Amino acid sequence: MAEQRYRVVERLAAGGMAEVFVGDAMSVQGFKKRVAIKRVLPHLASNENFIGMFLDEARLGARMNHANIVSVLDIGAADNTYFIVMEYVDGANLKTIIEVLLKQGRPVPMKEAVYIAMEACRGLSYAHELCDDDGNDLDIVHRDISPPNILISKRGEVKVTDFGLAKASTQLEKTDPGVVKGKFSYLAPEAALGDAVDERADLFAMGIVLWEMIAGKRLFLGDSDYQTVKLVQQANVPSLQAINPEADESLERVL
């Protein structure tokens, strides 16, 4: 791949638009570094709008350098499609961790849940405050904060990933008014209404994630996408203390 700079080891995950591989960055004298490689699926490589979004993600990621955000290392093209080379996080995403714990009949422990949320918020705060080379605010909004996009390494590092739906002032591809982006269950009410969003939408989504970690159940999940969106718009949040007595009053107020 890409003039032998990268070697694919195994496929890690695949979605409807891209697939992610574990790979190695190769260089002189046997140099090798483990990386993650996100590749556009071949049938989308000729879709100009999607490629524009993919390149926006790469450019935006390359600007960011923070311990709680997955680093973008390179971008390239091979086999008639594009790929992004990213920092490899040896661990699991939060969705997988929550699902494993739920099978055991327990939520994420309180201390760990708060730690994960705080670390993810540090990464988001950095992104929200990022400026361009001239000191102008980039106005970054992730727009897809959810358990699959929060990675936890085996060493306990927490990293936000996948800025593929992010909004920023530098984007080449703009979102049309009224278009909803992000997973329905983690939208802010204004996003569910198709209104413009700012960084508060990310904080709302992070609050949902924290609530779900501690409650051990989903917050906004209907029998259909339509019902889920209606629940988000209503934004009725049940008392966390009533579900998990370990949640103290101060945490309840924050959420």
Annotate the PLM regions.
Residues 9-16, 20:
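Protein kinase glycine-rich loop
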Residues 41-63:
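AlphaC helix of the eukaryotic protein kinase fold
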Residues 45-49, 154-196, 223:
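Activation segment of protein kinases
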Residues 79-93, 97:
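Conserved short submotifs of the Hanks-type protein kinase catalytic core
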Residues 122-140:
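Protein kinase catalytic-loop region centered on the HRD/HxD motif
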Residues 148-151, 161, 185-255:
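C-terminal lobe helix-coil module of Hanks-type protein kinase domains
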